[in-house]
Amino acid sequence: MSLDQAIPEALQALRTRFGAAVRAEQATGEAFPVLWLDASVWEAAHRFLREEIAAPFPLLADLWAIDESLRQHRTGQPASRITLCSHLVSLVRNADLRLKLATDGRAPSIAGVYANADWYEREAHDMFGLDFGRETRRILMPPTWEGHPLLKTHYARATEKPPFVLTDRLFEAEERATITDPDLLGLPKLRDGEELMVLNFGPHHPSTHGVLRILLGLDGEEVVWAWPDIGYHHRGAEKMAERQTWHGFIPYCDRIDYLGGVISELPYLLAVERLCGIAVPPRAQMIRVMLCEFYRIMNHLLFYGTMAQDVGAMSPVFYMFTDREKGHEILNAITGARMHPAFFRIGGVAMDLPDGWDAMVRGFLDWMPARLDEYERMVLRSELFRARTVGVGAYDTDTALTWGTTGPGLRATGCDWDLRKLRPYSGYEQFDFEVPLGQRGDIFDRTRVRADEMRESLKIIRQCLENMPEGPVKADHPLTTPPPRGAMQKDIETLIAHFLQSSWGTVVPAGEATGQIEGHRGLTQYAIVSDGGTQSYRTRIRTPSFAHLQMIPKIVPGMTVADLVAHIASIDFVMSDVDR
């Protein structure tokens, strides 16, 4: 089945099966179809697409909501107070499909179809108050929170609400809210008549790699059940996007995953550029690719060192941090920052490469291969490391897709899925590189895949060095690039346009667009909605870490606590990416 045939065939099968309940296909600028469904077939349609159709859609990449109450540009869309959106992916078809449901605040659950829908529905309940007809706990906000933050009626800034006063009564209520009763979660306290020990692992434990709490039920050292508790790092990033200009939100992207640098900026900008119809110049595209691969290496070096450290090898992390410092010196010279560069712009990058960039990059490329060889001897060939990781925390491709796992965690199972190859963006189709794969899907393979990915990133960076084109680094487009100063001095209309762009911000056409990339942790996706203004009406941020943590209760029962620590390290997440 060709790519051109893949989606029409799926849409026809869906319409044949559900008839008029497939209400309309929304006209968008997306690279995939967007369908509206009746609530009566919401669950059944998802089951059909996941289990019954040929070449199914096994991956629920995302599920989120939109408060439509203040939106003005909705031509051709059904009336809706809160719209529920699901984003499905078929690996066989290499195609996506988005389904939408118009709701009055109530929606059927699909958690019985896609296991990973549980956390996404909890988030939609938490942020929008959606009722899924089942018990739904808050997930990002504390249980004492009043209101639903992503509703348009909820305040966006602290200055819009009365001053906070911590009374004794409120303090006691907040303290009680931190106590979690396993009975209320449906978790057993007994095993074979013996009482389990309930352990709070985190939120301030070094092996949780951030403010993450995992409630554990232990029989001795064996993990019987695990319940992750997230949200401690939640900063309201999606709400912030509604209050910033389109350009002004770029620095916030860096903070979604503070180890990813410009990688976190790219999907947001791809979405805005798609909506605006902006073509990025070739030189800017290649600069973007080079910097993304640099930050991929920076992240993987940190993972590599802490992964070894969490199973008892203390030396590698110090050597790897030394090499990260070399990389960060180059990134600082190019972007002006190490970890939060805010360097990409709508239509290109902030500035051209500095003098001498090529010598710095070449020195790094000559240095790193031998270092990676040394790390392989220190870590991957270590009998102790292999004893702690081979066969531990293993899962197969079907399990990975069921729980929304992408990136190295999916490729470690042998699944060849990398958007840089399958759906090239920013010019990745020009580069020659391989996609490292594992076989067993265990901790060792997840480590091996990331180690090999660094070698491939070095190959990509070298090709950037040797083939960097000449030309501008920003599109000549009125929505992104200020007019020439000479024109502003002669033409009052040009001066006015520049003033409005600089003061009010870019006015993005009304519509919807999605940007997807193969991030260092997996699928990173921004879905934006513009209502024809200078700010986003809705920005949905799909991060890989959120999906990956939800898998913990499925994988860790039967492990020891020490193996749990190793498994957590092998996921490679940061809590800012989870909580946003």
Curated annotation (Swiss-Prot):
It is a peripheral membrane protein. Its main location: membrane. Residues 1-171 are annotated as: NADH dehydrogenase I subunit C. Residues 195-580 are annotated as: NADH dehydrogenase I subunit D. Keywords: Cell inner membrane, Cell membrane, Membrane, Multifunctional enzyme, NAD, Quinone, Translocase, Transport, Ubiquinone. Its EC number is 7.1.1.-. It is found in: Cell inner membrane. One of its GO terms (molecular function) is NADH:ubiquinone reductase (non-electrogenic) activity. The keyword Cell inner membrane applies. GO terms for cellular component: NADH dehydrogenase complex; plasma membrane. The keyword Cell inner membrane applies. InterPro entries: NADH_DH_suCD, NADH_Q_OxRdtase_suD, NADH_quin_OxRdtase_su_C/D-like, NADH_UbQ_OxRdtase_30kDa_su, NADH_UbQ_OxRdtase_49kDa_CS, NDH1_su_D/H, NiFe-Hase_large. It catalyses: a quinone + NADH + 5 H(+)(in) = a quinol + NAD(+) + 4 H(+)(out). It is an enzyme of class 7 (translocase). NDH-1 shuttles electrons from NADH, via FMN and iron-sulfur (Fe-S) centers, to quinones in the respiratory chain. The immediate electron acceptor for the enzyme in this species is believed to be ubiquinone. Couples the redox reaction to proton translocation (for every two electrons transferred, four hydrogen ions are translocated across the cytoplasmic membrane), and thus conserves the redox energy in a proton gradient. In the N-terminal section; belongs to the complex I 30 kDa subunit family. NDH-1 is composed of 13 different subunits. Subunits NuoB, CD, E, F, and G constitute the peripheral sector of the complex. This is NADH-quinone oxidoreductase subunit C/D. It comes from Cereibacter sphaeroides (strain ATCC 17023 / DSM 158 / JCM 6121 / CCUG 31486 / LMG 2827 / NBRC 12203 / NCIMB 8253 / ATH 2.4.1.) (Rhodobacter sphaeroides).
